[in-house]
């Protein structure tokens, strides 16, 4: 947890809604989302992909429902997974009604393209009857014609105006279980739009940089955009959009939250870039450790530093640490203090064992605390 004054983030106050059993907004944890890319009517493939995202730590998963076959498959999908499902709906209001009946926890819609006021009323009624929340999803790439004519191009003002227009549609139907997103592929536009929206409403915000790109460029863009917003206290749920597998989006989302001290899950490795002073191959060691420790869910910090220039100092701030030494022997730190040395050949196996032992202790402590509270 953050404990230094300069690490504190003051989160924007927002109302709280429910996405199935998961709370979004208010004082609820900032949740990590992803979206499947399988054909939704391929139930086996979609469920398998969601299970991989679950293992990566996802809180909420969105699936596209472009046709009746997709919504027909939704009930089977919902029954086989352990996280709430958001149905992504565009244009076809009947798909939203079908998804609500099938057990979707949330409907991602754009009230402006669902159709007439009567159709919007039917969608809202279905959401209310089946306990669904709604996400108003505004995107710079699909703004309404009248806003493009008014502003000349997509910009933050247009995104916010679209969002507020759609929010009013739901509010006019006395429906308030909704969250809002105003996404753009341009980081400046997206951040400015979310900043403006955060000033004029208290609805929970789903943040994201849309069409961010591939694994490397998308991670960088999302980290800049989402990191800036989260640092400013803006955002109640988030998706990192990558041209990559959903579980990779989840991993990056968690890394952003961990980097800001907002949520903690798994092993956070602090490592040096390596140089000629390294006492062991830092790059290879870190790659192996990250792979072998990927199954750990308990929050543990681990420093892997190749020499004594920064190693002891970094170890002061981590649960476990290794600093490269001479003659193939390296110092191991526990809770910031020197503990013992280890030979290079055995180091990786030894560190994995230490981390797994600490994770087991944390699980035992958590179970004991839970039992004591009951």
Swiss-Prot record:
Its cofactor is [4Fe-4S] cluster. [4Fe-4S] cluster binds at residues 272, 275, 307, 314. Binds 1 [4Fe-4S] cluster. GO terms for biological process: isopentenyl diphosphate biosynthetic process, methylerythritol 4-phosphate pathway; terpenoid biosynthetic process. It catalyses: (2E)-4-hydroxy-3-methylbut-2-enyl diphosphate + oxidized [flavodoxin] + H2O + 2 H(+) = 2-C-methyl-D-erythritol 2,4-cyclic diphosphate + reduced [flavodoxin]. The keyword Acyltransferase does not apply. Keywords: 4Fe-4S, Iron, Iron-sulfur, Isoprene biosynthesis, Metal-binding, Oxidoreductase. Its EC number is 1.17.7.3. Coiled coil: none annotated. One of its GO terms (molecular function) is 4 iron, 4 sulfur cluster binding. Pfam families: GcpE. Pathway: Isoprenoid biosynthesis; isopentenyl diphosphate biosynthesis via DXP pathway; isopentenyl diphosphate from 1-deoxy-D-xylulose 5-phosphate: step 5/6. Converts 2C-methyl-D-erythritol 2,4-cyclodiphosphate (ME-2,4cPP) into 1-hydroxy-2-methyl-2-(E)-butenyl 4-diphosphate. Belongs to the IspG family. PANTHER family: 4-HYDROXY-3-METHYLBUT-2-EN-1-YL DIPHOSPHATE SYNTHASE, 4-HYDROXY-3-METHYLBUT-2-EN-1-YL DIPHOSPHATE SYNTHASE (FERREDOXIN), CHLOROPLASTIC. This is 4-hydroxy-3-methylbut-2-en-1-yl diphosphate synthase (flavodoxin). It comes from Acidiphilium cryptum (strain JF-5). The lineage of its organism: Bacteria, Pseudomonadati, Pseudomonadota, Alphaproteobacteria, Acetobacterales. The gene is ispG.
């Amino acid at each position: 947890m953050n404990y230094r004054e300069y690490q504190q983030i003051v989160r924007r106050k927002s109302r709280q809604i429910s996405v199935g059993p998961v709370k979004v907004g208010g004082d609820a944890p900032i949740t990590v989302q992803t979206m499947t890319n399988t054909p939704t009517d391929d139930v086996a493939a979609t469920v398998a992909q969601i299970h991989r995202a679950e293992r990566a730590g996802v809180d909420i998963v969105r699936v596209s429902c472009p046709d009746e076959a997709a919504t027909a498959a939704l009930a089977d999908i919902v029954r086989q997974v352990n996280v709430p499902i958001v149905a992504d709906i565009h244009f076809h209001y009947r798909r939203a009604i079908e998804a609500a009946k099938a057990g979707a926890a949330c409907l991602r819609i754009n009230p402006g393209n669902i159709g007439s006021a009567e159709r919007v009323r039917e969608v809202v009624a279905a959401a209310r009857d089946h306990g669904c929340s709604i996400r108003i999803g505004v995107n710079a790439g699909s703004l309404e014609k009248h806003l493009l004519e008014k502003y000349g191009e997509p910009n933050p003002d247009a995104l916010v105006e679209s969002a507020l227009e759609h929010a009013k549609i739901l509010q006019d139907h006395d429906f308030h279980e909704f969250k809002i997103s105003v996404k753009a592929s341009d980081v400046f536009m997206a951040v400015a739009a979310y900043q403006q929206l955060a000033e004029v409403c208290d609805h929970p915000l789903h943040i994201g940089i849309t069409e961010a790109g591939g694994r490397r460029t998308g991670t960088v863009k999302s980290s800049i955009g989402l990191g800036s917003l989260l640092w400013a206290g803006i955002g109640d749920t988030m998706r990192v959009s990558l041209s990559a597998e959903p579980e990779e989006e989840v991993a990056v989302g968690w890394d952003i939250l961990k980097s800001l001290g907002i949520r903690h899950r798994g092993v956070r490795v602090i490592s040096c870039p390596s140089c000629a002073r390294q006492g062991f191959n830092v790059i290879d060691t870190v790659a192996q450790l990250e792979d072998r420790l990927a199954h750990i869910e308990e929050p543990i910090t681990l420093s892997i530093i190749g020499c004594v220039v920064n190693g002891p100092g970094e170890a002061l701030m981590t649960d476990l640490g290794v600093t490269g030494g001479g003659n193939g022997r390296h110092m191991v730190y526990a809770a910031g203090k020197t503990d013992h040395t280890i030979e290079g050949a055995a180091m990786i196996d030894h560190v994995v064992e230490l981390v797994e032992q600490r994770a087991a202790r944390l699980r035992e402590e958590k179970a004991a605390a839970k039992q004591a509270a009951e």
